[in-house]
């Protein structure tokens, strides 16, 4: 069974995936390998619509394996991805209040996030997406006051993962 981590930017999807297993798949990293540039560069050159098409193709390929997948925050923007998430078991929604997520995003200087350049726009995006995340989740974890290790333990308990 695949475990798929979803949630808004800054929720800790990649961090948690790394702690769950060494052999996790970071969807954003796979996409960057496929497009041979950063996601930020791709957004600037081709826009979000073209990015979402590639994201869907890479996601569908990743779903064919029994792996841990850390998705990008916008995975739910494509209806095809929403359908795929809805039919998959093991979808974990990592959530927190917007201010907590914004603080994390703002402190993360290693990741350029094209859709997080403006706080108000990011908050609107957060509000737009949060219900879709919740609809497809088999497990929702509020990460606000939890360490990555505590989150991993909850996931392991839910599915009996060692």
From Swiss-Prot:
Substrate binds at residues 28, 52, 73, 129. It catalyses: shikimate + ATP = 3-phosphoshikimate + ADP + H(+). PROSITE patterns: SHIKIMATE_KINASE. The keyword Cell membrane does not apply. Its EC number is 2.7.1.71. Its cofactor is Mg(2+). ATP binds at residues 10-15, 113. It is found in: Cytoplasm. Pathway: Metabolic intermediate biosynthesis; chorismate biosynthesis; chorismate from D-erythrose 4-phosphate and phosphoenolpyruvate: step 5/7. One of its GO terms (cellular component) is cytosol. Binds 1 Mg(2+) ion per subunit. Coiled coil: none annotated. Keywords: Amino-acid biosynthesis, Aromatic amino acid biosynthesis, ATP-binding, Cytoplasm, Kinase, Magnesium, Metal-binding, Nucleotide-binding, Transferase. It is an enzyme of class 2 (transferase). PANTHER family: SHIKIMATE KINASE, SHIKIMATE KINASE 1, CHLOROPLASTIC. Monomer. This is Shikimate kinase. It comes from Lactococcus lactis subsp. lactis (strain IL1403).
């Amino acid at each position: 069974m695949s475990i798929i981590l979803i949630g808004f930017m800054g929720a800790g999807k990649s961090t948690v995936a790394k702690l769950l297993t060494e052999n996790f798949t970071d969807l954003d990293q796979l996409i960057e390998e496929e497009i041979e540039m950063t996601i930020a560069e791709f957004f600037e050159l081709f826009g979000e619509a073209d990015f979402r098409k590639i994201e869907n193709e890479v996601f569908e390929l990743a779903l064919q394996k029994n792996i841990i997948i850390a998705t990008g925050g916008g995975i739910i923007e494509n209806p095809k991805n929403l359908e795929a998430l809805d039919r998959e078991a093991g979808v974990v929604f990592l959530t927190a209040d917007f201010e907590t997520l914004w603080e994390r995003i703002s402190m993360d200087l290693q990741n350029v996030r094209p859709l997080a350049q403006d706080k108000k726009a990011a908050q609107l995006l957060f509000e737009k997406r949060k219900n879709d995340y919740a609809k497809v989740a088999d497990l929702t974890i509020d990460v606000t006051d939890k360490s990555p290790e505590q989150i991993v333990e909850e996931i392991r308990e839910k599915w009996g993962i060692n």
